[in-house]
Amino acid sequence: MDLSNLKPAEGSVRKNSKRIGRGEGSGKGGTATRGHKGAKSRSGYSKKIGFEGGQMPLQRRVPKFGFTNRNRKVYQGINLDTLQNLVDEGRIKDTVDMDVLVENGLAGRNELVKILGRGELKAKLKISVHKFTASAKEAIEAAGGEVVTL
């Protein structure tokens, strides 16, 4: 092996591709691989998104339906098992109101809250929030707690 017969490893060197549109001498001048005439050969050409060659596009063939209710109220759901975990950790004492929920990161200051019935509640709590499911209300009262709707 000499310096005269060294060559790079197989596949380690890539031949640079020809740059298009750089004069006839480059081998890719003239039409620069775009063919002759027509919209696709012009600068600035791009197909419109959803264009189907003049056929009525899908988004116009499919009918409109439904609407968005602007007056919809969105409630932040909190389950009973979440409240029970906080009681077990000592982060909730005997009353649960918006201040306590915000403090513990369960709801935002301006959010509406709904207590949901998943899990089991053993603690006797006075809970005052915006809404309760029937099963949650039952479980809270069965544990000796109190339900207050804001």
From Swiss-Prot:
Biased composition (Gly residues): 23-32
SUPFAM superfamilies in alphabetical order: Ribosomal proteins L15p and L18e
Residue segments, region Disordered: 1-52
Pfam families the UniProt entry points to: Ribosomal_L27A
Listed GO MF terms: rRNA binding; structural constituent of ribosome
Gene3D superfamilies tied to this protein: 3.100.10.10
Highest taxon of source: Bacteria
UniProt KW keywords: Ribonucleoprotein, Ribosomal protein, RNA-binding, rRNA-binding
Record bears the keyword Ribosomal protein: yes
Signal peptide: none
Gene Ontology cellular-component annotations: cytosolic large ribosomal subunit
InterPro entries referenced in this protein's UniProt entry, alphabetically: Ribosomal_uL15 (IPR030878), Ribosomal_uL15/eL18 (IPR021131), Ribosomal_uL15/eL18_sf (IPR036227), Ribosomal_uL15_bac-type (IPR005749), Ribosomal_uL15_CS (IPR001196)
GO BP: any one term: translation
Database matches in PROSITE patterns: RIBOSOMAL_L15
Membership in a protein family: Belongs to the universal ribosomal protein uL15 family.
Quaternary structure, from the entry: Part of the 50S ribosomal subunit.
Protein task: Binds to the 23S rRNA.
Name of the featured protein: Large ribosomal subunit protein uL15
